[in-house]
Amino acid sequence: MEFGLSWVFLVAILKGVQCEVQLVESGGGLVQPGRSLRLSCTASGFTFGDYAMSWVRQAPGKGLEWVGFIRSKAYGGTTEYAASVKGRFTISRDDSKSIAYLQMNSLKTEDTAVYYCTR
């Protein structure tokens, strides 16, 4: 009985820690094809500069698609992109503000999606 209570307590602690991490996206909207849009991801609850940050998206009726990521400054702050967005999308970060950005240029109709940032 004592072991069971300890295990439940540990789960409660871990869930509480997880809930402290917040990633809030902003900047979305409707734009015409060919135009630009910049999304922001404001992070809290962890040391932002220590982590790589990724962007993924989900088009209507489809699964999640990886867009790209930016490494932490400790790993050069370099970026990688999906072939579908390479040359049009740029990911950047401002560690002093705990914000990751997704600059989207030359937008296409197929870029229509809900965009999420992930740690």
From Swiss-Prot:
Region annotation (Complementarity-determining-3) ranges: 118-119
Sequence segments annotated as region (Framework-3): 80-117
Region (Framework-2): 53-69
Keyword annotations from UniProtKB, A to Z: Adaptive immunity, Cell membrane, Disulfide bond, Immunity, Immunoglobulin, Immunoglobulin domain, Membrane, Secreted, Signal
Signal sequence region: 1-19
Subunit (UniProt): Immunoglobulins are composed of two identical heavy chains and two identical light chains; disulfide-linked.
Protein name per its UniProtKB record: Immunoglobulin heavy variable 3-49
Organism ancestry: Eukaryota, Metazoa, Chordata, Craniata, Vertebrata
